[in-house]
Amino acid sequence: MATTVPDPDAGLEPTFAAPPQACDAHFHVFGPAGRYPYGSDLRYAPPQAPLSEYLKLAGRLGFVRFVFVQPSAYGFDNSCMFDAMDELDPAVRRAIVDLDETKATDAQLADWHARGVRGIRVNISPVRQPEAGLSQSMLPRIARLAAICRELGWHLDFLTPGWLVSELMPMLRELPIGFTVAHFGLYPAKDGVKQPGFQGFLKLVNDGSQRCYVKLTGIYRFSLAPGFADVTPFARALIQTVPDQLIWGSDYPHLSFHDKVGTIGLYNKLGEWAPDPAARQRILVDNPARLFGFA
């Protein structure tokens, strides 16, 4: 049964003002289970997190542009997300879908593009352990999805554990379209920024093509330190290296962490990583506007 989302942000206020046209580039909505049934790959007990609750929080932070991301709980059924999108002005909303590329029709894809879809998610559980052959088995589907994205001007949105990002690196270097990588690439923060996986990731992101954008999201999924202090070196390395290829997202409603982590607290971390307002302007406004086509 869905549970009500508590408010870990109670008593907190933003430590900096969001710039005009700020974008939350990664969040989810969940509706009543009776109306929006969950798929077979249920990794967590989904909280009930309707758009109305999210918008209250977004209003406190100053976000006026929104990128919905299809959660794994709904599989290929994007209807909960689309219904929520219909409540917003099309000019301020975009979306990342999940889909069965073997069944998607040209008409369906064109309709989704008109509704604001700009990417397709490649989603492997962040806690999945190294598995021989997994990365190779993913390549045919990624190629099919990339062909769809290339035709429509979309990008691929990768959420995979860090070990899998590294195994996919040869493919990512040659991917003929733009792509995003969620949650800093999910490299364990305890291993530091000098770990070979993250150094290889930095090299990929900074290859000069500007194909790869990194989402400064989900830090509670790879950090074990109090206050997520061990994430700061990762954030600053990315901000110093590729400031024009970073976007920020709340990852609301934080799913299995929803009773422990608050969005305002996470937003305030960005102020610590990027004390320069010009850097935050890029991360919250300029970069997502370029990537998602906000006017």
Language-model regions, residue ranges each:
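Alpha-helical scaffold segments that flank or form the walls of functional sites
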Residues: 40-88, 110-111
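Acidic-and-aromatic substrate-binding clefts and catalytic sites of carbohydrate-active enzymes
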Residues: 70-76, 98-106, 128-132, 160-166, ...
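Catalytic pocket-lining loop regions of alpha/beta-barrel enzymes
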Residues: 134-248
